[in-house]
Amino acid sequence: MAEPLAVDPTGLSAAAAKLAGLVFPQPPAPIAVSGTDSVVAAINETMPSIESLVSDGLPGVKAALTRTASNMNAAADVYAKTDQSLGTSLSQYAFGSSGEGLAGVASVGGQPSQATQLLSTPVSQVTTQLGETAAELAPRVVATVPQLVQLAPHAVQMSQNASPIAQTISQTAQQAAQSAQGGSGPMPAQLASAEKPATEQAEPVHEVTNDDQGDQGDVQPAEVVAAARDEGAGASPGQQPGGGVPAQAMDTGAGARPAASPLAAPVDPSTPAPSTTTTL
């Protein structure tokens, strides 16, 4: 758990004073070796560069420490003044241990100011309200999470089912485009004419059968006439069947009359029919 931020202005001021009171020793005198050999010459050449690091850098270190101590004192002063100002401002509303403020602080018109009304609300009451609100929302959040988890597989399944449909539509569109470009595709099915009902376009089966039978009935008498002519070849006209009467006028029933020719005179119904019996 993180500790609350707290600044001790008194301790900060004491640390700044201790830092500013540090005393640094004086740098030693430069070292010089007398002699003429090569070792003496090397020492006299190397030592000044080493000593200069201390002698030249020590004043800068002292100045930096002094500046840091001064900044620490300034920060401690700022913290102290800010704490005092906040304490004075809060003391005007007389905050106590219970968190209640004075209700007697009023505005110029005699009505409590908005700040007084806000500050007069107990802190414990606000905390209680927040806790109750969080307790009411917790069950709803807990109940919503499982529903979202259950709906996730359905969403994935729907996306998978939609993929084949999209592929089918794409293939159909490509086939239609290829048929339009090639110009040699299957002819579309022709719909029934809107002017003629479907019942009239389709001829009933029994009507077709009757028409076929009627055609066969028309052809059959002609065949009978041809056979009769073949059998009666070489016979006398009186002995030939039909006696020159058209085949349509022949009848095997007793008392039947030959059909009248369109050019023949009308026959009286009361006149008896001539006999067509042939004597052998």
From Swiss-Prot:
Induction: Induced during stationary phase. Could be involved in regulation of growth and intracellular survival. This is ESX-1 secretion-associated protein EspJ. It is found in: Secreted. Phosphorylated at Ser-70. Residues 167-181, 246-280 have a biased composition (Low complexity). The keyword Secreted applies. Elicits a prominent immune response in human tuberculosis patients. Contains several epitopes, particularly in the C-terminal region. It comes from Mycobacterium tuberculosis (strain ATCC 25618 / H37Rv). GO terms for cellular component: extracellular region. The modification Phosphoserine is found at S70. The keyword Secreted applies. Residues 76-280 interact with EsxB and an artificial EsxB-EsxA heterodimer. Keywords: Phosphoprotein, Secreted, Virulence. Residues 167-280 are annotated as: Disordered. Disruption phenotype: Inactivation does not abolish EsxA (ESAT-6) secretion, EsxA-specific immunogenicity and enhanced virulence. Deletion mutants multiply more efficiently compared to wild-type strains. It comes from the Bacteria.
